[in-house]
Each structure stands twice: as C-alpha cells, then as structure tokens.
Amino acid sequence: MKIKEITIWKEDLALTRPYTIAYETISAVENVFVLLETDNGITGIGAGSPAEDVTGETITATETALSLKLAPILQGKDIRSCFSLLKELNTALADTPAALAAADIALHDLAAKTMGLPLVDLLGRVHDRLPTSITIGIMPVKETLAEAEEYLGRGFSILKIKTGLNVEEDIERIIRLNETFKSKICMRVDANQGYEVEELHHFFKKTVGLVEFIEQPLKAEHLEKMGQLPQAIRRVSAADETLLGPRDAAQMLHAPRPFGIFNIKLMKCGGIAPGLEIANMAGHADIDLMWGCMDESIVSIAGALHAAFSSRATRYLDLDGSLDLARDIVNGGFILENGWMRTTDQPGLGVKRI
C-alpha cells in the first residue's frame, strides 16, 4: 500500500455570481488539487484554495510548494504511516497552509479508503447532520431581501450576512431582513474585520436579539481591543482572520478571552489534522466551534465536514463554499437537504471524479 503516483494540478472553477465582503469583491476561484495513488490502485484526493488576504499565500505559492515538496515526502511511502507523513508535511509546508491542507486532505481520504470507511468514522463520529449557513454578500437592501428569499426557497434558513463597509447600512439590512422574514430565518453576521470599536458597539446595540453571532468584527491584529470589549459582545464574537492555526487558538484561551467562538477553516490552519488540534483545544476550554471555508471544491468542503462531525465542540457549519461554483471536478462528498448537511456512506471523503 505504497504511494506510487502523485499528481498536482490547478483548476479555474469560477463563480456563478461575484460577491462583496468588507475588503474585496470576489469573482474568480482557482483551486489546486492533489491526487495520490497507491500501488494497489486506491486514490486519495485533496484541494487547496489559498486566502491571500488572510494568510499571504497565493495560488502560485500553493502549486509551487506542492510541486517541490510533496514527492520527496510521500513518494514510495506506505499509507499506513499516514500520521507520521502528516507530521512531516506539517513541517515542510508550514508557510503555505492551503498547500498543506490539500496534501493533508488527500492523505486522510486515502487512509480512510484503504480501511474502507467514511473518513468521519475513522476520525470518530460525533454528529450525523447539522445545518449550514449560506452567505449573502454586501449589497443594497432590495437585493439582500431578494437573495434571502431565493435561499429560503432552496431550503436554507440560516443566513450569514456580510457586513463591514457601512455600519448604518448594515444595521438597516439586518432590521429589514428581520421585519420581512421574522422567525423563518436565523441570522449570523460576518464583518470581515470591517468595524472600529465604536461601530461595533453601535451595531451590537441596534441588532441585539436579531443576530446569533458576529464573525471577526475588528481587525485581526486588534486582539487586545477585542479582549477589552464587554463579555456580552465577546461571547457572541467568532474568531476568523485572527485564528489561523493552533498557535493562535492557544493564545486566545487565556483570560479575558476575546472570542466565544472559533471559526476553523482548513485553508487557514493547514488541513484536517491541524483543524482537529484546534478543535480539541476549544473543546477542553468550552469554546464553540464553527467550521467555515473559502470558495472551495467539494473535495475540501467534504474534508471540513468530516472533521466537523468528529468534534464534540462543533456547533455551527458555514460550508457553502462549493454551492456557487460554476464547475467542479468531483461530485458527491456530502448530502445537502433543506440546508442540512450529512456525509455519504462511501469510503474516504465520498467524492467521485466527474
């Protein structure tokens, strides 16, 4: 069961529609894929979608790191040594977390397939299904309401509203959504570092009781300012851009805790193994987990879902990153029904090349 072939390539997946967040408008999506094949014909696949604005990693850096560093570590190695191989990869690809995530996901997929198990059952299943949020970008009120209506019609009831450009317009959108849809929806907010402290206080005061929680309200480097906020705000604030890997998670466990929720993204932390490291810390510290994503192939969305379902600390999913892709290279990976996600019963990630 030795890895005999490693294939690395880049795909332009594109979006069906662009969307705007606090610091950019996104209209294009490129992912780097890794395919591992053993000498007995079993394959494992992984995908990387770097977030340059968050981690500094470009798609070129992702592809280059994998092309240069993967084969010396994995070529000819026995998949039964996958956890040792993951440790080697963690060291070699530490500066390119999306590249590390692609390799990590492929190894996990391959290991679970070798054992004939869905990945979550190899990791230790805790959850069978959970609802995911779906994202509405920054847009005028009329378009916000129309998009919310569309998503409700598709079975989603949890909406993540992007904010952070204009706090008064943000407040108006939240209030109008509540007036229009009331108990039909649950709202979460993602400010993407867009607020100053005074704006956050104002937003919180005007929307209290309407929003379940707010993601990354202040800039990532303003950790001390987050710690000085009232506990009522910190408890419903989720760390995103502030939380890259396990080291960041450990730092945020100390009082006063700046966030009550951690948002784990495989592309920030380096894949399933580092993600579960963060999850274990959060679980011991009674911090709730959300598992999020970039614009990603079903491959890595499935990886995040399997990891999420193996952690007792998981409370929230925000795994809509493949839903607006114009194309993908796989199908399967998960079953989505009325906004609820569950894994398939297929071995590994449960994805199939198209």
From Swiss-Prot:
Q: What is its EC number?
A: 5.1.1.-
CDD domains on file: L-Ala-DL-Glu_epimerase
Q: Which residues bind Mg(2+)?
A: 190, 215, 240
Which SMART domains does the entry link to?
MR_MLE (SM00922)
Superkingdom is Bacteria
Residues passing through the membrane, by range: none
In this chain, substrate is annotated as bound at 135, 160-162, 265, 295, 318-320
Cofactor names from the entry are: Mg(2+)
State the free-text cofactor note: Binds 1 Mg(2+) ion per subunit.
Which GO molecular-function terms appear in the entry?
A: metal ion binding; racemase and epimerase activity; racemase and epimerase activity, acting on amino acids and derivatives
Q: So what family is this one in?
A: Belongs to the mandelate racemase/muconate lactonizing enzyme family.
Q: Known PANTHER family for this protein?
A: O-SUCCINYLBENZOATE SYNTHASE (PTHR48073:SF2), O-SUCCINYLBENZOATE SYNTHASE-RELATED (PTHR48073)
Q: What does this protein do?
A: Catalyzes the epimerization of L-Lys-L-Arg to L-Lys-D-Arg (in vitro). Catalyzes the epimerization of positively charged dipeptides, with a preference for substrates with a basic amino acid in the second position. Has epimerase activity with L-Lys-L-Lys, L-Arg-L-Arg, L-Val-L-Arg, L-Val-L-Lys and L-Ala-L-Arg (in vitro).
Per its record, how is this protein called by name? L-Lys-D/L-Arg epimerase
The organism is Desulforapulum autotrophicum (strain ATCC 43914 / DSM 3382 / VKM B-1955 / HRM2)
